Amino acid sequence: MSKPRVFITREIPEVGIEMLEKEFEVEVWEDEREIPREILLEKVKDVDALVTMLSERIDREVFERAPRLRIVANYAVGYDNIDVEEATKRGIYVTNTPGVLTDATADLAFALLLATARHLVKGDKFTRSGEWKKRGVAWHPKWFLGYDVYGKTIGIIGFGRIGQAIAKRARGFDMRILYYSRTRKPEVEKELNAEFKPLDELLRESDFVVLAVPLNKETYHMINEERLKMMKRTAILINVARGKVIDTKALIKALKEGWIAGAGLDVYEEEPYYNEELFSLDNVVLTPHIGSATFGAREGMAKLVAENLIAFKRGEVPPTLVNREVLKVRKPGFQ
């Protein structure tokens, strides 16, 4: 009996590919750039499984071109790039990679927070460019004055795995921890000494606001002009969630006009992204969507992708199935 075919839309760590090759016929798109839409639509015609990145839109058009497709494994914790409702109707399983990238993303959130608060990027440029040497001044009491982090108030919007991991790091800085999520989490509140606050109250009280929510209809442009104006003028906004959670035009206005002190961004409304108006500001720290970019996290994601596909092939429910309603439509397996 021939092996089921899986197409992977980008090179993932070898550990995941090696696991899959034992059970599947594997094809990988090896170009650094994302796969062109027309090629993706051609590749899916005869595949049984698909491994996708956030950059690929997996929608009805893709499903219609893929009559054999039974499972889509997203190489990410988020899955807003996939039409999950349409997949479920067609009996197509959708999985993601939660858990394995939690700590890496939380680490980056704090890296952005510290870098923004303490002007690390500006200081690096000042030193590296030779400007420090040109000034001929070893130290000045008013250079690069930033904001204290220790003992301040952090407001975390979204209190799932990543939000809670950020809170754990905040405890090390003896911060007051506020959080907002759709549901209160009394046990976690007790464990992390965290306080639940309505969103607008959290924004008004926090020195640092960190976004860790999934993108959906409720969170799209959650941080808009009205809410940015609620924040302290000394507050710093960090986004490791999804770019579209923030209204970018409103954020630029806030940074320019001093409604808030600064921002640290890892995600953007469109990716890859360039915005001269935003990028010219010196009170924003920018990274190119690298929240999960550690060796350990990316290998863990690759393993979890493989584990999901292998479990499905064996007729088992994948460990991180997103659309559990699909179990009513089709049993797991390539039968």
From Swiss-Prot:
UniProt xrefs under Gene3D superfamilies: NAD(P)-binding Rossmann-like Domain
Q: What reaction does this catalyse?
A: glycolate + NAD(+) = glyoxylate + NADH + H(+)
Which amino acids does the record list as binding NADP(+)? F159, G160, R161, I162, S181, R182, T183, V240, A241, R242, H289, I290, G291
Where does it reside? Cytoplasm
SUPFAM superfamilies, per the entry? Formate/glycerate dehydrogenase catalytic domain-like, NAD(P)-binding Rossmann-fold domains
> Pfam families of this UniProt entry?
2-Hacid_dh, 2-Hacid_dh_C
A molecular function (GO) held by this record is: hydroxypyruvate reductase [NAD(P)H] activity
This protein is called: Glyoxylate reductase
Q: What organism is listed for this UniProt entry?
A: Pyrococcus abyssi (strain GE5 / Orsay)
Q: Which gene encodes it?
A: gyaR
